[in-house]
Structure formats: C-alpha cells, structure tokens
C-alpha cells in the first residue's frame, strides 16, 4: 500500500511501522487419506520497519507577510457574482485556490471591505483528489456581501502566497480590484 504524506513540521520525523495481522495456512506433519499434507490456519503479525525522514524547513528569507503555509503550485482567483447591484441586493464573492499541493493545510485570505458593507461568514467548499502524485483540486470560500448604502464600493485586491517547490521560492498572486 502506498500513501501520500504531508509533513507539518521540519526535522527528523519517524514514520511508525505498518503492522498487519494476517491468517496464513501452515503445513503440519500429518497427511490426509489421499497423501496430501494437511494445513492449519495460524494468525501471524507482519510489520514493515519504521522509516526516518528528514523534512527541511521552509526558508525564512523572502517569506511574504500573510503566508499561511501553502506549499505546491497554485492558481488564485477572486470572482464576484455581480458587479452592479440594485438597492437591497447581495452579491457572492468566491475566493478560490486550485492546483497541486497541501490544499487542506492552509487558510484562504479573507476579503477586506468597508464598514458600510456587511460581510457574512463564508461557505467553505473542497473538491480535492489525493492520487499518489499528490493532492490536487480546488478549495474555495463563498462570501455573501450586502452593501448598506448606495454607492461604489471597490473590493481591495487580495493576495495569496505559497511556496513553490519547483522553483524553491515564495510566490504571491494578487487579485485585481
């Protein structure tokens, strides 16, 4: 059996051995009337050895402010459901990260809105697969936004930072206003 592991701390980490209890058939010294060796069931425990791996820490140099632990190769989008509203209408703002990496181990950035706009807690959605090549898919937060007064309210650009294993550098993607 193969498993994808995502370390959450650096240093030397020990992976405990995998143990299985299996039933095996063991030959006895007796034979049946046809001369065949008789077998009995026995329970055996098999164990793989423990493994020690060395996990390098992420570099401190160049770490962006607001870095939340994303490691991999990602795309970042901020998409409003509408750009023009009538009085009393709301809009949904989708903040999404897609790609390959530790998708379940970081938090998405939260939009910053003026005090005259109500921002409700997000609905979190995950569409993730974990094949042996690594975790991939999309995570998103869907915010409902309701302006309290008529006017133009630009949504400030949002930034998402991640560590790109391919280049060995931090990368930051910023949404348009």
Predicted regions and their residues:
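Surface-exposed interaction/ligand-binding surfaces
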Residues: 1-177
């Amino acid at each position: 059996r193969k498993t994808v592991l995502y370390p959450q701390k650096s240093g030397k980490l020990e992976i405990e051995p995998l143990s299985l209890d299996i039933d095996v058939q063991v030959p006895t010294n007796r034979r049946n009337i046809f001369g065949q060796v008789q077998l009995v069931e026995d329970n055996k425990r098999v164990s793989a050895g423990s493994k020690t791996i060395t996990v390098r820490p992420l570099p401190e140099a160049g770490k962006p402010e607001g870095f939340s632990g994303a490691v991999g190769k990602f795309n970042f989008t901020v998409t409003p459901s509408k750009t023009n509203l009538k009085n009393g209408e709301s809009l949904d703002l989708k903040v999404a990260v897609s790609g390959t990496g530790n998708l379940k181990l970081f938090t998405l950035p939260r939009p910053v809105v003026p005090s005259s706009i109500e921002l409700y807690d997000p609905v979190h959605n995950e569409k993730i697969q974990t094949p042996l090549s690594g975790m991939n898919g999309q995570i998103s937060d869907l915010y409902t936004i309701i302006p309290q007064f008529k006017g133009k309210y630009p949504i400030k650009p949002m930034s998402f930072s991640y560590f790109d294993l391919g280049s060995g550098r931090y990368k930051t993607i910023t949404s348009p206003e």
